[in-house]
């Protein structure tokens, strides 16, 4: 799944097995290391961000395909909450993940709310003064993560700036656990979830606060969106479906997950023009 193999190692595996070799890199572009996979003889490269697919395919002519992340229903499903669970996990807003500088700066904007940030303790060099009361300094995994997501009124999923067009694994895990997912908007969301019915996206800090204020007191509406999100995640976004599609693509029966339609400006000799990423083949037109 990650870029651990040297090009010569990929070539040797291919030679010894006689079978196709593929890589599914389930991380954003800032965590691609040395990009060694671009120099290795992979038969297929799968990425979760359609931006990476479009660049590597269009500019490098690499055999790249879109394969979004997903959920594991064995771990990501609604769980029953005991009274002690509710006392421990309940809050207005929660999230789970590494407390990096981007997330620390982001959550300063939510200092007025009851917030719990689950994850490893922050690094010693990080100033967390403004969000200290939010930091739980404890990772939650599997059933504990499901409890944290379901017990909170809102699960805020602020995406890394390096998630250019796609979304992260929590964007699937949160709704799968029947949590209310308030996620950073990205161009690829609309193809994966119905915004406003299965998840809710926000465009900036002001939009985030506006939607937090709107949804916090509206429990019935939140629960309805969370239930619809769970149904969609379990129906369309599981590892079984992703692996089936990956194998079909490797053996020529499919071409990865359909790319979203994204309009953007591109420079030309005459200035700029609007182009669209084609859903069927990933080409620009």
Q: What residue spans do the PLM features occupy?
A:
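Nucleotide-sugar donor-binding catalytic core of glycosyltransferases
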Residues: 1-9, 36, 40-195, 253, ...
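Active-site proximal beta-strand in glycosyltransferases
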Residues: 13-28
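Short hydrophobic "strand-cap" motifs at the C-terminus of beta-strands
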Residues: 24-26, 95-98, 199
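Conserved acidic donor-binding segment of nucleotide-sugar-dependent glycosyltransferases
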Residues: 199-205, 215-219
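Catalytic phosphate/metal-binding cores of nucleic-acid and nucleotide-processing enzymes, i.e., regions
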Residues: 208
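C-terminal amphipathic helix plus adjacent low-complexity
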Residues: 211-285
